[in-house]
Amino acid sequence: MSLDKQIPIIYDFGENYEKNKDIWRRQCIYQILTDRFALDDHCTTAPSTGRMYLGGTWRGIIQKLDYIQSLGCTAVWISPIVKNIEGVTGYGEAYHGYWAEDLTQLNPHFGTKQDLTELVDQLHKRNMLCMIDIVVNHMAHAGDSPIDYSKYAPFNSPSHYHPKRFLHNYDDTWDCEIAWLGDEVVSLMDIRTEDQEVHNFFQNWIRDLIQTYHFDGLRIDTAKHVQKEFYPPFIAAANVFAFGEVYHGDPKFIAKYLEYIPSAANYPLYYQIENTFFPPKQSMNIFYQKAILEARATSMDTTILGNFTENHDVPRFLNRSTDYSLLCNTLTLLLFTDGIPIIFQGQEQMYAGGHDPENRDALWTSNYNQQNPIFQFLKKLIKLRQFLVDNVSGFTTELSNMLFVNEHVYVFRRPGVIIVVSNAGSNSDVDTSAEFSITERESLEFIDVLSGSQFSSLPTEDSSTISMNLEFSFPRVLVHRGLFHSMNELA
């Protein structure tokens, strides 16, 4: 039997695996870089850019939970919590949390054990979840001087690491798993995660971390740089939902990892959104083929992938296109396509930074403005999404159904809602009309949640038809009149 025809092994991800998937499908996640989200003293004029620690803390997050909850997000993903290397490197300080030195201690820049415990407790009191970012692939060393292994905990010997050799071929899986990331400025020392001693530590460590702080989920950094077999017992020990950063645009590549990790960041979707909207370089037809159909042709369950259009590793949308219509279309797609939507801090405030560190500017300079038009736009979409999650059977588990697609318009349906998006842009004079059929035979009234416009379906022999044109190529989010009124009554 050839390797590609073998039946995959079904791994045990813990006794609550199915329950955890169902819980996280229902969420809208807000991603936070702790150092860049909120200060203890509520200051909004402190320094906000660069590669140094700027002062954001866990207590600062606690003080701004009303802001996140007002937006509508139901879960918070916080950056790594462990002690990092200190001092200024050629790439600045370890404010982001991904340069670990001691896995047994918290990062003192972010606060105390009491602060972190209170943050999770306060989220739970609001019926919100907390996801923690973790790194199991590497520790960090600054400069090209000899490494003092004794300062690292618990991996304090050269025998805990693969031999020093920097990664050059990111498409070679074996090389990705044993070579070091980084360079001589900051080298990321690749941990021998295949060793049983390392396995044992990490399984005990993550079990203790979850039991101590009651985190609800894990985001695993640099997931493709660790042997896949490491993950199932590790995730079973955590017994919470986990998704990995598998930085690759091919859904077939991602699918291989989903035999070992419950979920992954949906980079294939991100790259297709980028090509279709940032600004448009391909048609909506091609988007549908590559982003939707090619993903479904794999073994992936796309309903549990983590979807995003911005994060701490890629330039902001508005850095590449200032078209407001395109921005709104990408956010509509993000909230309603199959999967779990993730909003990166600052996205709701129309931040426009480019590559690291410009895409990581502190949020306090926005003054946490809840009247920002994109904050209000997202709030409306998230409110509808959560209503559908809570009240419409199958919304989180049934795959979307394409109703219409052409060069500039894509229409799809999920239980309770019809989504119409376009990549034509606000200044385009191309045709953005759409006519599509739905299975209901009778005439139905739909309301666009974004504009308040009303649309009626016209009965045909075995279905009914809806016709519309997108003004300024702005998206439409259609719900049945009865559902619309029910949502407003519950507000």
UniProtKB/Swiss-Prot annotation:
Cofactor(s) for this UniProt protein: Ca(2+)
InterPro entries according to UniProt: A-amylase-like (IPR013777), Glyco_hydro_13_cat_dom (IPR006047), Glyco_hydro_b (IPR013780), Glycoside_hydrolase_SF (IPR017853)
Keywords, alphabetical: Calcium, Carbohydrate metabolism, Cytoplasm, Glycosidase, Hydrolase, Metal-binding, Nucleus
Binding-site positions, Ca(2+) 1: N137, E177, D190, H225
Predominant place of localization: cytoplasm
Note on cofactor: Binds 2 calcium ions per subunit.
GO BP term (any one): carbohydrate catabolic process
Keyword Cytoplasm part of the UniProt annotation: yes
CDD domains: AmyAc_euk_AmyA (cd11319)
Active site: D221, E245
Listed EC numbers: 3.2.1.-
Domain of life: Eukaryota
MF (Gene Ontology): alpha-amylase activity; calcium ion binding
Residues reported to bind substrate: W99, H138, R219, K224, H225, G249, H312, R360
Keyword Nucleus listed: yes
Chain sites annotated for binding Ca(2+) 2: D221, E245
UniProt site (Transition state stabilizer): D313
A Pfam family the protein falls into: Alpha-amylase
Family, similarity comment: Belongs to the glycosyl hydrolase 13 family.
Protein name: Uncharacterized glycosyl hydrolase C27E2.01
Source organism (scientific name): Schizosaccharomyces pombe (strain 972 / ATCC 24843)
